[in-house]
């Protein structure tokens, strides 16, 4: 094929290649990937909204939501790696290599200072607020107090402000008057857990499975294919550069809603491999890979139940609920450990570098669990004409879909049963003890 004709076909190849990639971007996935109906109507409550409602005899008392920030720009590190790859292509691109030439001509518009919330991310939060208000109108009624907290990261603070703005004048406070409490102790508990930082965050060997997969046959095949498309020796690429090209495809889709020319480098099978690489990192750094990943989140889990307890006590005393709406904005790294602590999305076999094929139908897919704007919502209800035990019930929603409780396989649980199921975590998971560095003969011991 002549170079000119091949270059003309590139847009078509991009469109075809990217059509099936959106579901494989892991933690860089759009929220619409888990709720496709929002692509048509961002305020839709979805086809099964009515089925998730409780009987009229049950009135919501409190909503506690833990959110991931909305769509963000790439990190500074990702932008540096992209600049490195883009620079190589600009230096080496030849007219006879249309894919490389097209990418070399691609405008590198990212800047390291962009490590913040994208405009799309603000809309994510505004629309989420409006949908939650429509789903739970009694809780979001006028003169209801909203307690809004966030991690100290700018993208989270911006997301919190956008969430409040999405509610408009529906609450008693003006859009700019609700203060956002910075609470890194709960939203970035992982930074405050010495054991996690020492044994996982700062320990290269903790990511052994991730690094092994980068050097494994599946990634080698993808790398060689990308190198061939770019007319580069395979030795000039590595797994990190291939991954940043794939992530650029994801960012262009999430931020600009456009199909990036970078997407043309990857087939759906390539995307599955790169998704697994992302999931391996999430699994070993934030999920079930090490107990400390999830146990460090017990401080947040316990706080959720302390607030639910308080609401139950106030209701029993016929007092107004002091905190009917509690919304906290954190990160994928906030939600993933919390869900692992609760036992969700756990596979029978651990994710490892050598079982990619066997994990084709795994539960642990980070893009399905914690995409941009992911949200875990606890709703406490008071139900009339019930026994004392059944008077208070709880519903959990992940990304606006009711979750099944482990102990009942139902989407509604009595509050007493839920507390009983998680009794060990609520009573015996002490953050200071869990996160304390173990010492042997006066020196820190490595437990991993």
From Swiss-Prot:
Induction: Repressed by parathyroid hormone-related protein PTHLH/PTHRP. Optimum pH is 4.5-7.5. It catalyses: 1D-myo-inositol hexakisphosphate + H2O = 1D-myo-inositol 1,2,4,5,6-pentakisphosphate + phosphate; 1D-myo-inositol 1,2,4,5,6-pentakisphosphate + H2O = 1D-myo-inositol 1,2,5,6-tetrakisphosphate + phosphate; 1D-myo-inositol 1,2,5,6-tetrakisphosphate + H2O = 1D-myo-inositol 1,2,6-trisphosphate + phosphate; 1D-myo-inositol 1,2,6-trisphosphate + H2O = 1D-myo-inositol 1,2-bisphosphate + phosphate. Keywords: Cell membrane, Endoplasmic reticulum, Glycoprotein, Hydrolase, Membrane, Secreted, Signal. N-glycosylated. Present in growth plate chondrocytes but not detectable in articular chondrocytes (at protein level). Spatially restricted to chondrocytes in the lower portion of the proliferative zone and the upper portion of the hypertrophic zone in the growth plate of long bones (at protein level). Weakly expressed in kidney, liver, lung, skin and spleen, and not detected in brain, heart and muscle. It holds the Pfam family His_Phos_2. Changing residue 27 to G: Loss of 96% of activity towards InsP6. The active site is at residue 69. GO terms for cellular component: endoplasmic reticulum lumen; extracellular space; plasma membrane. Its main location: endoplasmic reticulum. One of its GO terms (molecular function) is inositol phosphate phosphatase activity. GO terms for biological process: intracellular monoatomic cation homeostasis. It is an enzyme of class 3 (hydrolase). Monogastric animals cannot hydrolyze dietary inositol hexakisphosphate (InsP6) which makes up the bulk of organic phosphates in soybean, grains and other plant seeds which are the primary source of animal feed. The high activity of the chicken protein toward InsP6 offers a genetic strategy for improving InsP6 digestion in poultry and reducing the pollution that results from high phosphate content in manure. This is Multiple inositol polyphosphate phosphatase 1. It comes from Gallus gallus (Chicken). The gene is MINPP1.
């Amino acid at each position: 094929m002549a170079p000119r004709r091949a270059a003309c076909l590139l847009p078509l190849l991009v469109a075809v290649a990217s059509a099936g990639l959106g579901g494989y971007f892991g933690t860089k996935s759009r929220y619409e990937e888990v709720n496709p109906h929002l692509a048509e109507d961002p305020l839709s409550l979805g086809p099964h909204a009515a089925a998730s409602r409780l009987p009229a005899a049950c009135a919501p008392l409190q909503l506690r939501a833990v959110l991931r920030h909305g769509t963000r720009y790439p990190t500074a590190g990702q932008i540096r790696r992209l600049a490195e790859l883009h620079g190589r292509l600009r230096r080496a691109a030849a007219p006879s290599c249309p894919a490389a030439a097209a990418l070399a001509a691609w405008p590198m518009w990212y800047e390291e200072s962009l490590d913040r919330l994208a405009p799309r991310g603000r809309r994510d939060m505004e629309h989420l607020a409006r949908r939650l208000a429509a789903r739970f109108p009694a809780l979001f009624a006028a003169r209801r107090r909203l307690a809004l907290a966030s991690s100290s990261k700018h993208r989270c603070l911006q997301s919190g402000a956008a969430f409040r703005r999405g509610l408009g004048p529906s609450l008693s406070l003006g859009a700019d008057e609700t203060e956002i409490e910075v609470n890194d102790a709960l939203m970035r508990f992982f930074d405050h857990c010495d054991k996690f930082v020492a044994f996982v965050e700062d320990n290269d060997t903790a990511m052994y499975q991730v690094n092994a997969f980068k050097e494994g046959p599946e990634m080698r095949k993808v790398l060689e294919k990308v190198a061939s498309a770019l007319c580069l020796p395979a030795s000039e690429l590595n797994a990190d550069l291939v991954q940043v090209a794939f992530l650029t495809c994801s960012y262009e889709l999430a931020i600009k809603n456009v199909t990036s020319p970078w997407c043309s480098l990857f087939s759906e099978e390539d995307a599955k491999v790169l998704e697994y690489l992302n999931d391996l990192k999430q699994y070993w750094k934030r999920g079930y890979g090490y107990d400390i990943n999830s146990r460090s989140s017990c401080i947040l889990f316990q706080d959720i139940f302390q607030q639910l307890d308080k609401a139950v006590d106030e209701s029993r005393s016929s007092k107004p609920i002091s905190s009917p709406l509690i919304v906290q904005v954190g990160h994928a790294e906030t939600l993933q450990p919390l869900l692992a602590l609760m036992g969700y999305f756990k596979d029978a076999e651990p994710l490892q570098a050598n079982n990619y094929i066997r994990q084709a139908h795994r539960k642990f897919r980070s893009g399905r669990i914690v995409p941009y704007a992911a949200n875990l919502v606890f709703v406490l209800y008071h139900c009339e004409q019930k026994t004392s035990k059944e008077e208070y019930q709880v519903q959990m929603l992940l990304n606006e879909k009711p979750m099944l409780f482990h102990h009942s396989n139902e989407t509604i649980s009595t509050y007493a049963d839920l507390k009983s199921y998680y009794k060990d975590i609520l009573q015996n998971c002490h953050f200071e003890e869990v996160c304390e560095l173990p010492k042997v003969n006066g020196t820190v011991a490595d437990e991993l």
